[in-house]
C-alpha cells in the first residue's frame, strides 16, 4: 500500500512515521510514503501558491494552478491514486471508512492551508472529502495523519496481533471493554480499586461474556448514540 501527502509543510509529517508501530511496518515494506510540496510546482519565481479570494472574504486561498500541477503529476505516474481532500465541510471519518480505505492501493491526502483550496481543484480530482470533526484546524496535515494511522491499523501485518483490532472500540458499534493490568488490587489514599474477579478465573467464555456486558454498559454511558445503533442492529 502507498500513501502520498500533498502539503506545504511535509517536514511536519515525516517524523510521525519514524517511531513505534508504523516505523516497524514501514521497515517491513508494508507501506510506502511520498511527500509532495505544491510550492515545487508553482510557476512564479517566489514559489507562491496562495492569493486573495475572488469576490472578497477574509484570508488567502491555495490557488488552482500549482495544486492542479502537483496532483496531475501524481496521476501521470499511473499508480491508481485515490485522492482524499481534508476539509471541515467533508463527511466525518470513522472506523468503517478506515477499514474500507485500507483496501486501496494508493491514497493521496491533499492537505489545505490558509482558507482552504480553490474549489475547482476538488471538482477535478476529489474522490472523497473528509473531516475529523466539527472544528477548525490550521491545516489538513493533522487530519491526514489521523486518518493514515487509522487506515494502516487495518492493513494486514501492521499490528503484531490482529485479534487486538477485532476487540477495539467501534467494532459492532460498541466501545472497547474496560481493560486492566497488574496489580489486581490498586490502592491509593486508603482506597482499594479492584480488577473484576472473573478476569482471574481463566474461564474464557465467561470472560468474553463479561467483556461484552462491560462494553455495552460503557457505550451506553459514554456514547448513547452508538449504543442505540448497536441495539437497532441486534
From Swiss-Prot:
Its main location: cytoplasm. The keyword Transferase applies. Disulfide bonds: none annotated. One of its GO terms (biological process) is tRNA N1-guanine methylation. It is found in: Cytoplasm. Keywords: Cytoplasm, Methyltransferase, S-adenosyl-L-methionine, Transferase, tRNA processing. It comes from the Bacteria. The keyword Ribosomal protein does not apply. It is an enzyme of class 2 (transferase). Specifically methylates guanosine-37 in various tRNAs. Belongs to the RNA methyltransferase TrmD family. Its EC number is 2.1.1.228. Homodimer. GO terms for molecular function: tRNA (guanine(37)-N1)-methyltransferase activity. It catalyses: guanosine(37) in tRNA + S-adenosyl-L-methionine = N(1)-methylguanosine(37) in tRNA + S-adenosyl-L-homocysteine + H(+). GO terms for cellular component: cytosol. This is tRNA (guanine-N(1)-)-methyltransferase. The gene is trmD. S-adenosyl-L-methionine binds at residues 112, 132-137. CDD domains: TrmD-like (cd18080). InterPro entries: Alpha/beta_knot_MTases, tRNA_m1G_MeTrfase_C_sf, tRNA_m1G_MeTrfase_TrmD, tRNA_m1G_MTases_N, tRNA_MeTrfase_TRMD/TRM10.
